[in-house]
């Protein structure tokens, strides 16, 4: 049973990191692995953040403390980066 629990923990972490990578690409922080280019789409980044928020809501009370912290830390980091990128974009328009 412990092996299944560890496997699920790894899969949960992988799911979070997949959304995190997609958000970082949309924020223009990471290169798109397909195009090898950096481009920014804040609407798309917001979508990935909302997916992670939904995951937090739907899994509340059903994850380990470790899994909870991974998700909360990822969300916090992405939200800060989103605010930074959005403010850069606003300053660039002024």
Question: Which residues make up each language-model segment?
Answer:
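N-terminal intrinsically disordered, cationic/polar leader segments
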Residues: 1-50, 54, 65-94
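Acidic, glycine-enriched active-site microenvironments
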Residues: 59
